[in-house]
A protein has these predicted regions:
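Cyclophilin-like peptidyl-prolyl cis-trans isomerases
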Residues: 1-163
Length: 163
């Protein structure tokens, strides 16, 4: 792996590895990584407990996307806080495998995310893109509703990613 920050999604269907855009969307990536590692205070899980482990992919629309990160498993849950969108001109929904924040409108990001099956340009500047699948798009495409995210591991490669 090149220097960078990565998320390894260990699912019931296999592994997905995503390169995280920590330089272009530092707030969004920081939130995601902190929840994944259990370092961010939230209303759902005690600090020190990885937030995403065991959650389901609660919404799957074939030929569109898979969505996860809801602690209720319904799409209505979150960590108990919201944060602003973080758009970057270089990050678009222009290909399969884009990792983006799910939300209910501007400034309503929390813990829910989705990964695309196809390019979805109509989502640009509505949902924060913060990563791209580099391995396992076949797994993304194989996931069905209620498959589980067994664990989410953050991988740091190089000095900048470890900072």
């Amino acid at each position: 792996m090149k220097d960078g920050l990565y998320a390894k999604f260990n699912t019931t269907k296999g592994e997905i590895i995503v390169a995280l855009e920590y330089k272009k969307t530092p707030g969004t990536v920081g939130n995601f990584v902190s929840l994944a590692e259990g370092n961010l205070e939230n209303e759902i899980k005690p600090q020190g407990t990885p937030y995403y482990n065991g959650l389901k992919f609660h919404r799957v629309i074939p030929d569109f996307m898979i969505q996860g990160g809801c602690p209720k498993g319904t799409g209505s849950g979150g960590p108990g806080y919201q944060f602003d969108d973080e758009f970057h001109p270089d990050l678009k929904h222009n290909a399969p495998g884009i990792l983006s924040m799910a939300n209910a409108g501007p400034g309503t990001n929390g813990s829910q995310f989705f990964i695309t099956h196809i390019a979805t340009p109509w989502l640009d500047n509505k949902h924060t893109v913060f990563g791209k699948v580099i391995e396992g798009q076949d797994i993304v495409d194989a996931i069905v509703q209620n498959d589980s995210l067994v664990s989410l591991e953050i991988i740091r490669v190089g000095k900048e990613a470890e900072a």
